[in-house]
Amino acid sequence: MISFESDYNNGMLPEILEALGKTNSDKTSGYGFDPYSESAKEKIRKAVDNENAEVFFLIGGTQTNTTVIDSVLMGCEGVICVETGHIEVHESGAVEAFGHKVITLPGKNSKLTTGTLSAYMDTFLADESHPHMVQPGMVYISMPTEFGMVYTREELAALYATCQKYDLRLFIDGARLGYGLVSAACDYDLPFLAKHCDVFYIGGTKVGAMMGEAVVFSGMKAPKYFFTNVKRHGALLAKGRMLGIQFDTLFTDELYFKISRHAIAMATRIRSIFEKHGIAIAYDSPTNQQFVVLSPALYEALSPKVAFEIWERKSEHEIICRFVTSWATKEEELDELNHILQAYA
């Protein structure tokens, strides 16, 4: 069976495995206070073009989201995101478990617009009883979005300006950041993104690492006791160098972006294969997540041979399915998918 189920169903990049093996016998301090982690942090500061950026390594995406949100917000504050936002739909209520309401707004193509945000904030502030409500303190977006969409340069700049207008912190979930930044739809680079948010993270788990995310405070200072809060949230790895080594490797010779470009090339081809066989594209995603519309019959025919995910049962005749590429996707796997589809053309 070939698999396009997710971008974290392989182990890790061979380069990372090699680096971990070479350093296995080293003895270093724990919790990220080691030379490998320091080297990785310095490389990330250089990559974001901000020598004052504060960088922290956490073990996973959900832990990262809850830790950042809980650390930045006061107890009475909530976080705004679109209705399809990852923290709203796919994190088991983790943010709210730490006492912060997720305030959902409708998105446009899975993105939050400045118009929607401004309208909500104006209405909220005009309500005389708003001091009795959960106070919006942060905006959360993901880049790319849950549907693989990319915020443009203009959209991101406008959204950050709107957040600043209403004294909201902007937090960007970058679990798949590499794939978003190298896509043809993205008209900016990592330094631009870092300058147009308060805090973001660089995803490792879904972009070649065994595990780990790198939180970067680029537009604000890290909250007091952030490191302690990382541990409180269960996101601190005792053998912290394991994360440092991985990000040090990813940010050597632009490996992070090279593997992301490979995934995008594979996604572009997988889309063309579906289109060649007359299979409709559900969402115009320019990144490594591709969404197609399958009939129940085609779904049943593909399932024993190809691993992928049902995204939405749109109707009794249409099933939206997600196919995901990664650093590990091989041309031969796409050839096999094409061959399988030919039998049902």
State where each predicted segment sits:
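Active-site C-terminal subdomain of aminotransferase-like
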Residues: 135, 142, 150, 187-286
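Catalytic PLP-binding core of fold-type I/II PLP enzymes
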Residues: 151-183
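Conserved N-terminal alpha-helix of the aminotransferase class I/II PLP-enzyme fold
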Residues: 13-61, 83-88, 94
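Conserved PLP-anchoring active-site segment centered on the Schiff-base-forming lysine
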Residues: 71-89, 118
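PLP-dependent aminotransferase-class I/II
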Residues: 99-137, 141-144, 151-158
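Conserved core of the PLP fold type I
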Residues: 54-73, 103-110
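Conserved C-terminal alpha-helix-loop-beta "cap" of PLP-dependent enzymes
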Residues: 75-76, 268-269, 273-343
